[in-house]
A protein has these predicted regions:
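Conserved substrate/cofactor phosphate-moiety recognition/catalytic segment
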Residues: 19, 23-63
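The conserved Walker
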Residues: 10
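A glycine- and Lys/Arg-enriched "phosphate-lid" helix/loop adjacent to the NTP-binding pocket
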Residues: 101-146
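Glycine-rich phosphate-binding loop used to anchor ATP phosphates in small-molecule kinases
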Residues: 56-109
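Hydrophobic anchor at the beta1->P-loop junction of P-loop NTPases
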Residues: 6
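NTP-dependent small-molecule kinase module
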Residues: 148-180
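Conserved Walker
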Residues: 16
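Conserved glycine(s) of the Walker
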Residues: 13
Length: 180
């Protein structure tokens, strides 16, 4: 089994996938977003941003991930790394695909209003609960557009894109079965 990089937009099922897969396997889970937030707070001069919207941080984190994945490649342990701050075009040359499977999660085919309803129904903590509906709709519209761009880039770089616009749990369970 290869190591796994899970990337994609916020609230696309990345963490849920990682938790489910780690529970069924011996993969160690590394959520990069905690490190991103720490770098933002502790080293502001690095220019790392941990906003929900992917920005120039993707290039910087891809360089960091290159070093991390190279170190992991020298171990016998298996890892799942997940991040909401990476674009396919930035990671493609920074990871050894012989040792890593890469999956991007997004929701390019759902309306912001429908995604908002899903979030309000299922998400009971975290940053979405601190946003009012109008704020969240604005963010979701941007994330839907980023999902579309990720999907396009994934096709270009032959990276698997998991569309979680609908049937999120089913899509996650299908991917886990495929990996196992």
């Amino acid at each position: 089994m290869k190591n796994i990089l899970i990337a994609g937009v916020a609230k696309s099922g990345k963490s849920l996938f990682c938790k489910k897969l780690a529970k069924k396997t011996n993969y160690n889970h590394i959520p990069i977003d905690y490190f991103t937030a720490s770098m933002k707070r502790n080293f502001p001069n690095w220019g790392i941003k941990s906003s929900v919207i992917i920005n120039d941080t993707s290039k910087k984190l891809s360089t960091l991930l290159n070093t991390v994945t190279n170190l992991i490649d020298d171990t016998d342990e298996k890892f799942i790394i997940d991040s909401a701050h990476i674009m396919p075009s930035d990671i493609i040359d920074n990871i050894n695909r012989d040792n890593w499977n890469i999956y991007f999660f997004g929701y390019p085919n759902i309306s912001a209003k429908d995604k908002l309803c899903e979030i309000r129904k299922y998400i009971k903590d975290g940053w979405p609960t601190k946003k009012d509906d109008n704020e969240l709709i604005t963010i979701l519209e941007k994330l839907i557009n980023i999902s579309k761009e990720m999907n396009t880039q994934c096709k270009k770089y032959n990276i698997k894109f998991i569309d979680t616009s609908f049937d999120l749990n089913k899509k996650i369970d299908e991917l886990i079965k495929k990996i196992l």
